[in-house]
Amino acid sequence: MKHKVTFEQDGFVRVPGFCDAEELQTIETALARFIAERVPALPVEDVFYEDKSDTCSLKQIQRMHEHDDFFAQLIEGKPKQLAEELLSGQVVCKNLQYFNKPPALGQATPPHQDGYYFMLEPCHAVTMWMALDPADEENGCVRYVRGSHTRGLRPHVRTNTLGFSQGINDYGSEYDCENETACPAQPGDLLAHHALTIHRADANQSTTRSRRALGFIFYGESAREDAEAHDIYQKHLAWEMAKVGKI
């Protein structure tokens, strides 16, 4: 319950050592296999590269649990249990993602609220981010605006950031700056935030270190998605990314 109290108060919670060394090694082995064997056959809209001609610039993979039994079991385990605690009830597993900020290539993640992308009523959802590499201020750790989940959805505008197509257009108020909190993480540490919590991350300034992570998204059972609007948005986004050679 301690995680739930912090989550409801701050809009996010840090869970150090969510996965231990043995669990991480199992995940790393499965991830390497997935990238080698599954990624080449995935739909183009599920795989993003900083530079499509360079496979080493892999930035995001979407819906991994729909393409592989290991990751389907992973999202149904400890992450789902935590989501049910944080949202006080049954949840729906929506996405298991891979994120990377490659050395010197990884762009900044614009300030945003996941709820803007989710298109839910009510906006009852949680996103989790589990570090696979050490994440710090040099390579772009996640930054949250404490308490922002209580202040509603902010206006968003189109961005040019791959994988984060919308960002808050008026970010930087006194409230934002005073309440922004950097959240460094070690491999296996997990961060969970409410769908209305504002968060961002700086670019990867390191020339040698990646900043890899897995993401888990869960909707509360009461949340209803505007499926038609979401589908139109996703199709248009895929068209735009294909046009500029990102997928």
Regions found by a protein language model. Give the residues of each.
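Short, structured patches in soluble enzyme cores that scaffold and shape functional sites
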Residues: 97, 113, 130-134, 146
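Non-heme Fe(II)-dependent double-stranded beta-helix
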Residues: 2-10, 16-111, 117-120, 157, ...
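Double-stranded beta-helix
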Residues: 135-200, 223-224, 239-243
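Short conserved catalytic/interaction loops centered on acidic-Pro-aromatic/His motifs
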Residues: 142, 202-211, 225-230
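A short hydrophobic beta-strand segment most commonly corresponding to one strand
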Residues: 128-130, 209-223
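Short beta-strand His + acidic residue motifs that chelate non-heme Fe in jelly-roll/DSBH
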Residues: 128, 193, 199-207
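Histidine-centered catalytic micro-motifs
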Residues: 109-116, 195-201, 216
